[in-house]
Amino acid sequence: MKKSKKKVIWFTGLSGSGKTTLANQLSIHLKKSKYTVNILDGDEVRAGLCSDLKFSDKDRKENIRRVAELASLLIKQSDYVIVATISPNNQLRSLAKKIIGNDFFKLVYLSTSLDSCQSRDPKGLYKKAFAGEIKNFTGLGATFESPTSFDLKIDTSEISIKQSIEKIISMLNIK
């Protein structure tokens, strides 16, 4: 096994920006290099660990707190933990970083435009939001605040998945 520099790679961006896709592809790449990896996908965490939470500001904060606490525990047993969650504002991302620790936390901002995310709509969520079936949907009814500080910025509408993974691997300074 290669020497690891344990990191939590925290993807933030709008729904449809490519967080889950990149998390899964990054995991495959890292596992091929014999690293241990865990993925925390926002949709999966919301369906299980955070199924009691709604989308109020208070519940969004608690959701991110729980995800960050879990990532903090998992990084003790893994080389990499990959988190794919919208985390819609700087306050929540700062909370996650504080819980996980500055030495472990790497923020990857997927800056893909709202128009691109809406045209992709892989889960049909924008369609539901426009139909009024989802209230306070981030990017439409609820605000997404672009990060003021990040380790890497990627627009997945401008570069390929492969190029995105290469940029992340370079940021992590691994092969």
Please describe what each predicted stretch is.
Residues 15:
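The conserved Walker
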Residues 24-69:
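Conserved substrate/cofactor phosphate-moiety recognition/catalytic segment
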Residues 19:
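Conserved lysine of the Walker
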Residues 111-167, 174-175:
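Small-molecule kinase domains that catalyze NTP-dependent phosphoryl transfer to phosphate-bearing small molecules
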Residues 11:
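Hydrophobic anchor at the beta1->P-loop junction of P-loop NTPases
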Residues 8, 39, 105-109, 151-153:
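Conserved beta-strand scaffold positions in the cores of enzyme catalytic domains, especially
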